Regions:
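Conserved ABC transporter NBD signature motif
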Residues: 16-24, 33
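Conserved ABC ATPase "signature" region
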Residues: 68-87
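Helix-to-loop junction immediately C-terminal to a conserved catalytic motif
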Residues: 8
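Conserved ABC ATPase signature
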Residues: 92-96, 100
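ABC ATPase "signature
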Residues: 177-178, 186
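Conserved catalytic motifs of ABC-family nucleotide-binding domains
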Residues: 113
Length: 235
């Protein structure tokens, strides 16, 4: 959480620098910096007295967008997170499921088209099934929009399934930054190796490889397996 807040300057670093696209963020006015950064917290953080549309529209209203543009953006984002605008636009947070609340939280963070999305354990409060759907939604949105996502999680499986690069931290220090596969194959310390787990490591590696990479031509019996499924799922 402290690391995320240093990225958007809610906390100023006591040493070192934070750079975005090579620019030292300390040289930018904080309010201008934050306009390019969305923030999703654990438990969604929606305003309970406002509708879904009003929650999503918070930042665009602060930026002075016209009403019609805001309405169009709200509907666009609800469709992006796969919530029907006509059904959900006027609901309040207590009328939504946990997964729906989290989707609205993501939509709100994306409202002003930020280049970076900060997510602080966004799925920690969700049940397993809802969490898996939310992770799939995030991956789809990230690929569709090209947004850079910095996500904090204590779940290694979540990190390796979602991330292009994983940074392992302990006591406020980054121990290793690597692709999920490199992290699994070459942990740099006993702490990282223990985090991965000795008996779990082969299965975590299988989860990173799609079936399509090892598929061979020919016929086979049994139920079909999706080419995009992981080898772990196939096993």
């Amino acid at each position: 959480t402290t690391l995320l807040r240093m990225i958007n300057r809610m906390i100023e670093p006591s040493a070192g620098r934070v750079r975005i696209n090579g620019t030292d963020t300390a040289q930018l006015p904080p309010h201008l910096l934050r306009r390019g950064i969305g923030y999703v917290i654990q438990g969604h953080g929606l305003f309970p007295h406002r509708t879904v549309a009003e929650n999503i529209a918070v930042v665009p209203r602060l930026l002075g967008w016209k009403t019609a543009r805001i309405a169009d953006r709200v509907d666009e984002l609800l469709e992006l997170v796969q919530l029907d605008p006509a059904t959900f636009r006027d609901r309040r947070p207590h009328e939504l499921s946990g997964g729906q609340q989290q989707r609205v939280g993501v939509a709100r963070a994306l409202a002003a088209r930020p280049d970076i999305l900060l997510m602080d354990e966004p799925f920690g409060a969700l049940d397993l099934l809802t969490r898996e759907r939310a992770q799939a939604d995030l991956q789809r949105i990230r690929l569709e929009l090209g947004t850079t996502v910095v996500l904090i999680t204590h779940d290694l499986a979540e990190a390796t399934s979602l991330a292009d690069r994983v940074a392992v931290m302990d006591r406020g220090r980054i121990l290793q930054v690597a692709t999920p596969e490199t992290l699994m194959r070459r942990p740099v310390s006993d702490f990282v190796a223990a985090l991965i787990g000795g008996t779990e490591r082969p299965f975590r590696l299988l989860a990173l490889c799609p079936v399509s990479k090892l598929r061979e031509p020919g016929n086979a019996g049994g139920p079909p397996i999706s080419a995009t499924a992981s080898l772990h799922a196939a096993l």
